[in-house]
Amino acid sequence: MLDYLMRKILVTSALPYANGSIHLGHLVEYIQTDIWVRFQKMQGNLTYYICADDTHGTPIMLMAEQENITPEKLVENIHKEHLKDFQDFHVNFDNFYSTNSLENKELSENIYKALVKNNKIFEKEIEQFYDPDKKMFLPDRFIKGECPKCKTKDQYGDSCESCGSTYNPTDLINPYSVLTGSSPVKKKTKHYFFKLSECSDFLSNWTKSGTLQKEARNKLEEWFKAGLSDWDISRDAPYFGFEIPDAPGKFFYVWLDAPIGYMASFKNFANNNKLSFDDFWKNNSNAELVHFIGKDILYFHALFWPATLEYSGYRKPTKIYAHGFLTVNGEKMSKSRGTFITARSYLDNIKNPNFLRYYYASKLNDSMEDLDLNLEDFSVKVNSDLVGKFINIPSRTSGFISKYFENKLVPIKNIEDKKARELILRITEMKDLVLEHYELRLFSKLTKLIMSQVEALNEFVSTKEPWILAKNKSEHKTNSDLHQTCSTCLHAFRLLSIYLTPIIPELSSKISLLFKENPYDSFSNIEIEAVEINKYEHLIHRLDLKNVESMVDSDNK
């Protein structure tokens, strides 16, 4: 059994980049994090969920240029869109901010100055590709050419999609600028570097401190053996971002100020809510700092980020939880494969966010394995589990309580049937296991555990046949059996609904109304017993496969 004493926890999800819409791949992480945060809050832990849009970099500068608006206006528009998508999927941030903020500028500059003071920054002349027509240095993804290993054409400047090789942009054969099509020239420039190579001993010890999953530690060991390279933290103008102090025309690379955005978002939240920033970020803070990320940004979060914090005087993360990628029908998400789906397209066509939240939960665990959204399986599973089994319980039994017993439930202590009492007791006593699965992010195990009891409850209903009992209810024994059978089912259903609240919060709120209660905001609701119900109203509609097909079509035309 886990220790559930009151904790202080600051939780983050990776910052979505402000150059496009939220898609179903993004939502894996935000739903996973939101479930865990809701669980912690229902436990009574002081928990804050912080995020922000990642707003800096060349892609945003160029996108704004194409749309003939300022980068500031672009990221403002994207922020509104992102926030609406998250809200409609019931991802409940305490603060969703922006890295293009005064707080982030101040923190980035102060952290940089601390790194300089600690002799962790140096200047070096490097050679990069430069587009003479656009008059700018080209990031890796804005250069294409032939792969130096397999000779495949039109590959990006950092890696080959054909053979998987990684390389420097200057290794490309016949390189060209993605922006203008012209041949880039090599040009020397001075950049600022963080001495990551000097941090190997600290990072090697820190990454073994229990902060990371075993798979993540193993991956880091590979990087340690290969040797850590110093990190280029600067970019040349023109660039949308924060200018480096005392370095005109040089800007912080987006990956320096983006994670500092966690701090900035919390600082903004703390200032607006009279909280102490230092209580969560000072070096000896007793609060937990938990990052949820995708495995593709493990290098930044498990190496650059803790080293930056260590040598600028701030606390390090308590836990970093990395998850795998989403595939759709076994394929990588892409328009060319017909597997790219935005959050808004899902909402426009399927409408019910509970379905995706539940399906993702049924697939998620504590590993970095990829998970697949098989659209046919998705439709079958949510219809079977949520509609056919879970909501089937009140739809089969609550009507009898309203029609024959004035909406009153038999108190649990007065239920005489042995199997009925055992059923409720079993569901009540699995609370500790439910909480443990939530804490350890074993959501797949959790949903299986709950569904096993949902199935047992449906079997109980089928065995008792309340619809038959209702026909013979004039007999006292039959009338009592009908009342107790339906009350058993509804008491048990209510308990299971409380367990599922972090996963399907909106549906849980509707269920609480059935029992004339406020939305379930604590697992202590388990100890309270419902005494009567409202008349049953339809809680959920089946998912039509046609809606799934129209969702796919709308994003992949």
Predicted regions and their residues:
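Structured secondary-structure scaffolds
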Residues: L2-C51, E103-L107, C150, S159, ...
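Basic, alpha-helical terminal appendages of large translation-related enzymes
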Residues: L2-K8, K124-F129, D133, F142-G164, ...
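N-terminal Rossmann-like or analogous alpha/beta NTP/dinucleotide-binding catalytic cores
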Residues: Y4-K124, K135-M136, P148, T211
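Short amphipathic alpha-helical coiled-coil/interface segments
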Residues: I78-H79, Y112, F224, I427-K431, ...
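Short acidic (Asp/Glu) and glycine-rich catalytic loops that position anionic groups and cofactors
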Residues: F89-V91, S285, T327, S336-G338, ...
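Cys/His-rich microdomains that often coordinate metals
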Residues: L138, K153-Q155, Y167, P184
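Long, amphipathic alpha-helical stalk/connector segments used for oligomerization, subunit docking
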Residues: D372-V382, T397-I415, K419-K445
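Amphipathic alpha-helix face/heptad-repeat signature
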Residues: V382, L386-K389, I393, K419, ...
